[in-house]
């Protein structure tokens, strides 16, 4: 929608769209929105021009990873077809993937142009961008095996058997189609079903489950550009400018989905009391959680 220039010199533009679908590769569904709001004003004498813009495009899309340690082999593609996705399966009947990208990076800017006289122009711009999101993946081991092991996939379809992972993590007994089985036990220290126990379990299984984590790559970006242009002659123009900006990167990992477990034992910080900390809070990577870029993540 666009008003065109109105009598007071103002103009307003607005755009909003949505797209969703399934990718060519199995298990690569996607959903995205796009929004744009623009306001402009020009003075009657044409000396001042102001523009205010806010735009962004929150999106999520499931992926087929090319990670060396977590991807299908040529034999897998020969067996399951070229669209096969090693990270894909169904959880409670819904598509679920180890790998999901999610991001929202809105940007707001204010631009001002001022024609001081016929040979002198001043322009200034201030902008603010907030990026929030990242990508998900597996973390943990079960019986010494990583999530990339074929024992956690259906031999007929090649899909990850998510429901069995949930049953195993939650102490209900996971039984995979390939014959592997495991049942998590209650953690003595917490009384909960905890994944990533550092000790051998009572049945000798090294580690005891998987969860989905998210690696966050967020940022705050603020800046301003100011330029003064002076035309001295037909052959000589002077420009004086200022470019100020500040950037803060926010990089960490968080729990995305516990897959039936009550928590995850974290050993990544040597300052933890007792050498570890149990994490129970999860943060969703669903599209609906991306709109508010100022919330606690």
Residue ranges, per PLM feature:
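Outer-membrane beta-barrel proteins
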Residues: 21-27, 59-65, 75-76, 132-137, ...
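Short, glycine/charged-enriched secondary-structure capping and boundary segments
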Residues: 28-30, 67, 121, 139, ...
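Short N-terminal secondary-structure initiator segments
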Residues: 15-35, 104-106, 210-227, 276-286
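Outer-membrane beta-barrel transmembrane strands
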Residues: 92-137, 204, 208-243, 250-251, ...
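Acidic/polar loop-and-plug regions of large Gram-negative outer-membrane beta-barrel proteins
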Residues: 40, 49-111, 135-214, 276-293
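Signature of Gram-negative outer-membrane beta-barrel scaffolds
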Residues: 211, 237-297
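Short, surface-exposed, polar/charged, turn-prone segments marking secondary-structure boundaries
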Residues: 9-12, 16, 40-44, 78-83, ...
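Transmembrane beta-barrel wall of Gram-negative outer-membrane proteins
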Residues: 1-20, 25-64, 107-116
């Amino acid at each position: 929608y666009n008003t065109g220039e109105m009598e007071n010199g103002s103009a307003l533009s607005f755009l909003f769209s949505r797209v969703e679908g399934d990718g060519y590769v199995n298990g690569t569904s996607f959903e995205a929105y796009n929004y744009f709001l623009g306001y402009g004003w020009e003075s009657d004498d044409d000396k001042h021009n102001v523009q205010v813009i806010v735009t962004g495009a929150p999106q999520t899309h499931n992926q087929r990873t090319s990670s060396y340690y977590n991807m299908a082999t040529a034999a897998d593609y020969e067996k399951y077809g070229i669209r096969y996705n090693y990270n894909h399966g169904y959880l409670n009947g819904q598509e679920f993937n180890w790998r999901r990208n999610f991001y929202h990076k809105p940007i707001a800017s204010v631009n001002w142009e001022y024609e001081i006289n016929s040979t002198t122009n001043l322009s200034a711009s201030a902008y603010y961008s907030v990026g929030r999101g990242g990508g998900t993946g597996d973390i943990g081991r079960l019986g010494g095996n990583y999530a990339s092991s074929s024992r956690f996939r259906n031999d007929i379809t090649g899909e990850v058997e998510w429901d069995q992972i949930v049953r195993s993590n939650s102490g209900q007994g996971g039984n995979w189609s390939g014959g592997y089985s495991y049942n998590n036990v209650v953690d003595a220290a917490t009384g909960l079903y905890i994944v990533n126990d550092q000790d051998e379990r009572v049945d000798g299984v090294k580690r005891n489950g998987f969860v989905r984590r998210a690696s966050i790559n967020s940022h705050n970006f603020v800046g301003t550009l100011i330029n003064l242009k002076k035309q001295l002659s037909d052959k000589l123009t002077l420009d004086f400018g200022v470019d100020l900006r500040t950037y803060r990167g926010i990089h960490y990992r968080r729990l995305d989905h516990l897959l039936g477990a009550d928590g995850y034992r974290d050993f990544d910080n040597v300052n933890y009391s007792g050498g570890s900390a149990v994490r129970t809070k999860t943060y969703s990577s669903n599209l609906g959680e991306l709109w508010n870029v100022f919330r606690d993540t």
